[in-house]
């Protein structure tokens, strides 16, 4: 029968994995951005300062401390702390609004008895009595006055071990620190025109925004770290802070050079690499105490992440090289624990990560130069793996760690089941880290490296952030692709082609001869014969069949098979839990969902049409599973599809998969199915009603839905090609014998052909109505 094509597609479509996802990605995301090259067009390269990329500071690099700056007089920005780092005692800083606030800070050494000293404040010599009773801590004291000729009063103070001090203008106040480290807190002085206060720093200083006040307080209390990530290596003038730094954008497509046919594109990309290790643990035969192999194997990982506001789909393949083989032999007895070989990666090993994403950079990655990358490092730690021996405490392989450091990048190709991806291979060298690994309850301990037993340590993936840059030779016309693999059709063009093809298919319905259709519906159409009418080569036909299978996997018919399998599994578990009538009825309704509809009739939110569609879909699958000699709706659907494919002038490899899938879902939407038991026919109509009638009388009577469900479970389902209304009309107007009625009820193709050859208008109208329902 012609419906064989649908069963073949259902069988073969489940072998498709990554390729159809990549095809979908390529066809739906094909935007291209060209950046004005500006002054770098002649020099080929932009002045790019490559770093780890635009990544979160908390996970990749330490926060950058703005400074140090040389002593100077300036108007510091509002809501920014000046972190002062004096090296000697004396005046640290001073500032005034020249109206009602003169404020200065002095630094006093530890262990200073009360003494009078002279300081130069605002150009005047001032005598100040100072002291510091602390034996170890330096003392910061604020000297403040409110008139130009007034006397200074002392405030604060701050006793400090790190010898750091902070001043900030904010909210009509001047803030400083007071108390004693490591528990110093902030205080303030009210002032007018605070934003115009000029500050003079007599020592090196840093600038920290108010949003990072907690970090500033940490520095005040505990001091700067021994090695801090600063903006400047040595103190520089504060005016350098106003210089605008031009950096490459995280995602940038730059036209380096261009001719009529080709152009060089520089792609700059921030990337997030996620990868994981895979392993193989093989147990030897015998009593269960011996393992033959614990080894690494390549691992694929597909994921999405956001880059510069755009969601990116990426695929990585992780593999290892330079593996070290270890073994453990607990003895020669059959019950002695043995691992014949377990693999460990160490400092002499390498990890390769092949990376591909759906951005424009990878679309034409064929002719490439100036490839460079900068990636962060990542530490990989081993987890605990228990070797389940029959008796006794389990030996446990635990620990081990290595860190991965970028060692280069090259072009590579990732191979999947159906396509190959031009990708980047990032090579990482390894260094061993703490802790070492061991096998508990054995003599193995204190070994360094990462064993293959549990290399991911219960993590879903490891993550590395960074960026790469390359220059690729691509066609000048963005609609073209470098000839390396099959080109990707832009989705908008595909939709236009499909719209034209649907119109053509619908118009062809009137050109189908019914006698030929019946003969064609009886042929066992397979994929090759279905597509053989396409004016193309055999190789192209094979490619079309593959594309159809990939697309058919996502059809509603294929999804119905999965849903039906779940329902049958639930029904089987329901029987095992309870032998009640409700459980049995639930089981019987696996094809029809009768029990669900009945029990939820008071609270259901789905419409009758939705329920009927679900029931019809289940009955369709049941009919496919129990193929009879009669003709069914899918035979007619496939025959019409074959006829239209042969007559079409617009089909190609891109539109055919969509058309075949749509035909399986949309052809003949109104379907009725029946079950025959002895002389009684039970039928589910397209309006959601169940009824029965005798073959002899053809008089309708309603019956229980549960009875229909029970019969569907045990009896073959038949397509109502000649439905009850047509059959009764035929009997009332022409009169038919019991055997003719039975043959029509069974959808016997021989009897159908006889009525069509006799030009019976009732049968012809019914078949024509089915053909006209074969629309997209």
Curated annotation (Swiss-Prot):
A single GO BP: permeabilization of host organelle membrane involved in viral entry into host cell
Site feature Cleavage, where: 231-232, 241-242, 247-248
Cytoplasm is among the record's keywords: no
Region (Spike foot) residue spans: 510-776
Ranges for region Spike body and stalk (antigen domain): 248-479
Keywords, alphabetical: Capsid protein, Coiled coil, Disulfide bond, Hemagglutinin, Host cell membrane, Host cytoplasm, Host cytoskeleton, Host endoplasmic reticulum, Host membrane, Host-virus interaction, Membrane, Outer capsid protein, Viral attachment to host cell, Viral penetration into host cytoplasm, Viral penetration via permeabilization of host membrane, Virion, Virus entry into host cell
Motif (YGL motif): 448-450
Motif (KID motif): 644-646
UniProt KW DNA repair keyword: no
Segments of this protein annotated with the region Hydrophobic: 389-409
Cellular component terms per the entry's GO annotation: host cell endoplasmic reticulum-Golgi intermediate compartment; host cell plasma membrane; host cell rough endoplasmic reticulum; host cytoskeleton; membrane; viral outer capsid
One Pfam family hit: Rota_VP4_MID
Sequence motif DGE motif, residues: 308-310
Entry coiled-coil feature ranges: 484-518
Disulfide-linked positions: 203-216, 318-380
Region annotated Spike head, chain positions: 65-224
Signal peptide stretch: none
Record site: Binding to sialic acid: 101, 190
Further comment: In group A rotaviruses, VP4 defines the P serotype. Some rotavirus strains are neuraminidase-sensitive and require sialic acid to attach to the cell surface. Some rotavirus strains are integrin-dependent. Some rotavirus strains depend on ganglioside for their entry into the host cell. Hsp70 also seems to be involved in the entry of some strains.
Family: Belongs to the rotavirus VP4 family.
Name of protein: Outer capsid protein VP4
Species: Rotavirus A (strain RVA/Cow/Canada/C486/1977/G6P6[1]) (RV-A)
């Amino acid at each position: 029968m012609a419906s064989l094509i649908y069963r073949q597609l259902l069988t073969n479509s489940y072998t498709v994995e990554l390729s159809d996802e990549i095809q979908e990605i390529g066809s739906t995301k094909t935007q291209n951005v060209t950046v004005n090259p500006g002054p770098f067009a002649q020099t080929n390269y932009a002045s790019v300062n490559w770093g780890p990329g635009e990544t979160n500071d908390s996970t990749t690099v330490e926060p950058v401390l703005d400074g140090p700056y040389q002593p100077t007089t300036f108007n510091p920005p509002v809501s920014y702390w000046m972190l002062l780092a004096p090296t000697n005692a004396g005046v640290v800083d001073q500032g005034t609004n020249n109206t009602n606030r003169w404020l200065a800070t002095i630094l006093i050494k530890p262990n200073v008895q009360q003494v009078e000293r002279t300081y130069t404040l605002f150009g005047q010599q001032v005598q100040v009595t100072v002291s510091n009773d602390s034996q170890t801590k330096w003392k910061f004291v604020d000297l403040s006055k409110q008139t130009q000729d007034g006397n200074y009063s002392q405030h604060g103070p701050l006793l400090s071990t790190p010898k750091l001090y902070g001043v900030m203008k904010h909210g009509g106040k001047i803030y400083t620190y007071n108390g004693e480290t490591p528990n110093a807190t902030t205080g303030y002085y009210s002032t007018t025109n605070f934003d115009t206060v000029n500050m003079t720093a007599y020592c090196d200083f840093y600038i920290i925004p108010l949003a990072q006040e907690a970090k500033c307080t940490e520095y005040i209390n505990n001091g700067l770290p021994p090695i801090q990530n600063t903006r400047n290596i040595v103190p520089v003038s504060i005016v350098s802070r106003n210089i605008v730094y031009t950096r490459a954008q995280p995602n940038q497509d730059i036209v380096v050079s261009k001719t009529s046919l080709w152009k060089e594109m520089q792609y700059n990309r921030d990337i997030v690499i996620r990868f994981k290790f895979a392993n193989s643990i093989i147990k030897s035969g015998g009593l269960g105490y011996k393992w033959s192999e614990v080894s690494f194997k390549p691992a694929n990982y597909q994921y999405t992440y956001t880059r510069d506001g755009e969601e990116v789909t990426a695929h990585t393949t992780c593999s290892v090289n330079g593996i070290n083989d270890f073994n453990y032999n607990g003895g020669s007895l059959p019950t002695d624990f043995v691992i014949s070989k377990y693999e460990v990666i160490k400092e002499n090993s390498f990890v390769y990560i092949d990376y591909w994403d759906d951005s424009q950079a990878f679309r034409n990655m064929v002719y490439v130069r100036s490839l460079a990358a900068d990636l962060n490092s990542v530490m990989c730690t081993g987890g605990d793996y228990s070797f389940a021996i029959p008796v006794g405490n389990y030996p446990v392989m635990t620990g081990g760690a290595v860190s991965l450091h970028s060692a280069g990048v090259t072009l590579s190709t990732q191979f999947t089941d159906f396509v190959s991806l031009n990708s980047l291979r990032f090579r990482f060298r390894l260094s061993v880290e703490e802790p070492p690994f061991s096998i508990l309850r054995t003599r193995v301990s204190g070994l360094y490296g990462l064993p293959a037993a549990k290399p991911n340590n219960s993590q879903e993936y490891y993550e590395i952030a960074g960026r790469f840059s390359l220059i690729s030779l691509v066609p000048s016309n963005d609609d073209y692709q470098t000839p390396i693999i099959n080109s990707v059709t832009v989705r908008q063009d595909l939709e236009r082609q499909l719209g034209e093809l649907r119109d053509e298919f619908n118009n062809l319905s009137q050109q189908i001869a019914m006698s030929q259709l019946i003969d064609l519906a009886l042929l066992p159409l397979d994929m090759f014969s279905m597509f053989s009418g396409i004016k193309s080569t055999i190789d192209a036909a094979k490619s079309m069949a593959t594309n159809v299978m990939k697309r058919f996997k996502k059809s509603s018919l294929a999804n119905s098979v999965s849903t039906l399998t779940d329902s049958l599994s639930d029904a089987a578990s329901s029987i095992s839990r309870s032998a009640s009538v409700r459980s049995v009825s639930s089981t019987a309704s696996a094809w029809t969902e009768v029990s669900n509809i009945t029990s939820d009739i008071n609270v259901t939110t789905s419409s009758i049409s939705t329920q009927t569609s679900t029931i019809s879909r289940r009955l369709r699958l049941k009919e496919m599973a129990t193929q009879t000699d009669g003709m069914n709706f899918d035979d007619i659907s496939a025959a019409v599809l074959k006829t239209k494919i042969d007559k079409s002038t617009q089909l190609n490899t891109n539109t055919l998969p969509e058309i075949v899938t749509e035909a399986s879902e949309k052809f003949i939407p109104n379907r009725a199915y029946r079950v025959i038991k002895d002389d009684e026919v039970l039928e589910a109509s397209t309006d959601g009603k169940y009824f029965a009638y005798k073959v002899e009388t053809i008089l309708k009577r309603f019956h229980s839905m549960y009875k229909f469900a029970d019969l569907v479970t045990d009896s073959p389902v038949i397509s109502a090609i000649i439905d009850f209304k047509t059959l009764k009309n035929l009997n009332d107007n022409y009169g038919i014998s019991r055997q003719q009625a039975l043959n029509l009820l069974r959808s016997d193709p021989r009897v159908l052909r006889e009525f069509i050859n006799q030009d019976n208008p009732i049968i012809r109208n019914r078949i024509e109505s089915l053909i006209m329902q074969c629309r997209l």
